[in-house]
Structures are given as structure tokens and as C-alpha cells.
Amino acid sequence: WDTFAMEGRGIRCVSDEPWVTAAETAECSLAHAAVGDLSTATDLLYWTRAHRTDDGSYMTGIVYPSFEHFPAGERTAYTGAAVIMAADAITASSPAAKLFLPTFAAD
């Protein structure tokens, strides 16, 4: 956690650079939800909001402390999808949320 998490900002995609991505952060949220740690999962999902643009899409990454978006202007479908899956895993809003529950394999 200490290597990759930038508290309140997100999850780094590499350990030695000061940038976080919404997708890495959402994927970490999914992992926490899958093991039942919904508090941390919710915090991580909240951290992705800094990446959200006015049109609802998500910038791929943010460099800190400069707040530069990288790659410049990039808003990928996989980033939005990761955020949606994390939200669903936490809230169980759709049947797909069961994919991330520890009991899914037993169903």
C-alpha cells in the first residue's frame, strides 16, 4: 500500500513516478470490494472523482503535484469501465456485481 497508494489521490501505475490513474484506482477498489473491505473500496472509488470531466468521462491519469493530465487529453473506455465496475461491486446495483463477490464461485 505504502508503495503504490497516494493517500487521497489514487493508486500509482508505477512505483517510482508521482502519477495515478483512475483505472488503477478503480481496480484496487474492486479488489478491496472482492475481499469484503467496502470501506476502503468506497474511499478508493471516491478518489477517482478527480479524474472525472464535465461530460462524465474520466481522464486516464493525473501527475502530482502539478495536476497535469496524462496522456494529455486521453479519456479511455477502459478507464470508465473500471470505475463503473468498481461502483457496481460496492453497491451491487446489477447482477454483474456478483462477479466480484467472494461467494460467486460457490453459487
Language model features with spans:
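Extended glycan-interaction surfaces of carbohydrate-active proteins
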Residues: 1-20, 43, 49-107
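Generic helix N-cap/helix-start motif at coil->alpha-helix transitions
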Residues: 21-25
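Residue at a conserved register position within TPR or TPR-like alpha-solenoid repeats
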Residues: 29-32, 87
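Alpha-helical positions within canonical tetratricopeptide repeat
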Residues: 39-40
